[in-house]
């Protein structure tokens, strides 16, 4: 379990940093949660210490690549928001290329970043089984919800018009939907929210490399 938390912390940290100048709502969501749950700050600090300790103890450990099963919840109002399987697969491909440092422009890494550029030995795949039953790892839910506001949790619950998360201890949940305003997406840090809202939310025009993705964001 500790290893899973560590991997997800890396993933969400990278997502938050890469979107910092592109209207990522991660920090705003975190601040909003901490205002009503101030005890989460101490828990997050404690987790950070444990992660740093784990890193020091395992810095020379040899490990094989870890594969994280992903479930993509497509919550849509109309056909244009109901992105294709192919579009979803392109985003998974981009994640794997980036985390395994197999992206085509890896050789163009700026000199200052070369010491830190590495194969993270983390891979992602769409979930193949859920509750013992074969699955595509893709859930489609048509909704009457308007655009999803940054501080709304409706996207995370089927009874509220969204799509409920699969076991967040076993799957990385990603919700793709129409997000209100200029927010492109957000992610939840460990101890940064309800376990049922744990995952990543991305606007359908900023997901993948084909289909509905906006021209400026076709690199996944």
What are these regions (language model features)?
Residues 1-25, 95:
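Bacterial Sec-dependent N-terminal signal peptides
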Residues 5-6, 32, 143:
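Sequence-pattern detector for short linear motifs
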Residues 10, 74-76, 128-130:
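Short glycine-rich, polar/acidic loop-and-turn segments at beta strand-coil junctions
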Residues 19-65, 99:
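N-terminal zymogen propeptides
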Residues 52-96, 175-181:
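Fold-level signature of zinc-dependent metallopeptidase catalytic domains
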Residues 89, 93-220:
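Metzincin-family zinc-dependent endopeptidase catalytic domain
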């Amino acid at each position: 379990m500790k290893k899973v938390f560590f991997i997800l912390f890396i993933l969400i940290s990278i997502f938050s940093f890469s979107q910092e100048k592109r209207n990522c709502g991660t920090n705003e969501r975190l601040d909003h949660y901490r205002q009503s749950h101030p005890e989460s700050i101490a828990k997050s600090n404690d987790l950070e210490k444990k992660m740093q300790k784990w890193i020091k103890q395992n810095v020379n450990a040899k490990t094989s690549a870890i594969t994280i099963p992903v479930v993509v919840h497509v919550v849509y109002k109309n056909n244009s928001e109901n992105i294709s399987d192919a579009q979803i697969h392109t985003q998974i491909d981009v994640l794997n290329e980036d985390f395994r440092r197999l992206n085509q422009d890896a050789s163009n890494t700026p000199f200052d970043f070369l010491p830190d550029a590495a194969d993270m030995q983390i891979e992602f795949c769409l979930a193949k089984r859920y509750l013992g039953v074969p699955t595509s790892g893709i859930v489609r839910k048509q909704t009457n919800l308007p655009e999803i506001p940054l501080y709304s949790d409706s996207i995370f619950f089927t009874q509220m018009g969204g799509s409920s998360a699969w076991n967040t201890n076993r799957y990385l949940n990603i919700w793709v939907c129409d997000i209100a305003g200029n927010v492109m997406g957000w992610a939840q840090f460990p101890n940064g929210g309800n376990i049922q809202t744990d995952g990543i939310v991305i606007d359908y025009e900023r997901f993948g490399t084909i289909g509905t993705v906006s021209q400026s964001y076709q690199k996944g």
